[in-house]
A protein has these predicted regions:
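Nucleotide/pyrophosphate-binding catalytic subdomain
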Residues: 1-200
């Protein structure tokens, strides 16, 4: 099975997502790894910086701005009211989740969870778009199979075994959409591969 990887610029707008969808729907089964939409991870880092500095007002301002941008992407990406609604609900749940971190202690652990949201959103958006187009696509959660060892290097045996389990849950899928950049560490905590580390 082919594995294709698209970085943030490739999925940086609704139009670019549609172009990627055309490229990947050629009748062959494949796993498609997506980054966050371009600029998203940097913005999430900026939000995290405000939270480290105990400035929830600054963080919320940037969160609201980013959410508005995503609502526009949703409007441009989907053609039907049903999928526009699904997309808006998706965005709301992720941004409400990010906002929940403005109220409590913020550490490196919370930052890693916040940074993971970009990939989780972009892959869910693409999965919905493919489904709206009638493609049998499935979201493969990277957090269920992607793990690093105690040296922060990918754990190939674990990854292969767990990925196989995930694939077997959806034998009829044509396209498997999954996240780059995010993983769990050797202790099961949400972690991030190094920037560019999705190439693993």
């Amino acid at each position: 099975m082919k594995v294709l990887k698209f970085g943030g610029t490739s999925v940086g707008s609704a139009q670019r997502m549609k172009e990627v969808a055309k490229l990947i729907t050629d009748g062959e089964r494949k796993i498609v790894v997506l980054s966050a939409m371009s600029g998203t991870t940097n913005t999430l880092v900026e939000i995290s910086d405000y939270l480290y500095k105990k400035n929830p007002e600054g963080a919320n301002e940037i969160i609201n701005r980013l959410e508005t941008k995503y609502r526009q992407h949703i409007d441009e990406l989907y053609a039907t009211p049903e999928y526009k609604q699904k997309g808006l609900e998706l965005i709301k749940s992720h941004f409400d989740y990010i906002r929940s971190y403005t109220k409590d202690l913020f550490t490196l652990f919370e930052e890693k969870v916040v940074l993971a949201q970009g990939e989780l959103i972009s892959t869910a958006m693409m999965n919905y778009y493919l489904q709206e187009c009638g493609v049998k696509s499935v979201l493969l959660p990277a957090l269920e199979y992607m793990r690093t060892d105690k040296n922060a290097e990918p754990d190939p045996v674990y990854i292969k075994d767990k990925l196989q389990v995930q694939l077997e849950l959806h034998p009829d899928a044509e396209i498997y959409i999954t996240q780059g950049f995010i993983c769990r560490n050797a202790y099961g905590e949400v972690d991030n591969l190094q920037r560019g580390g999705s190439d693993y």
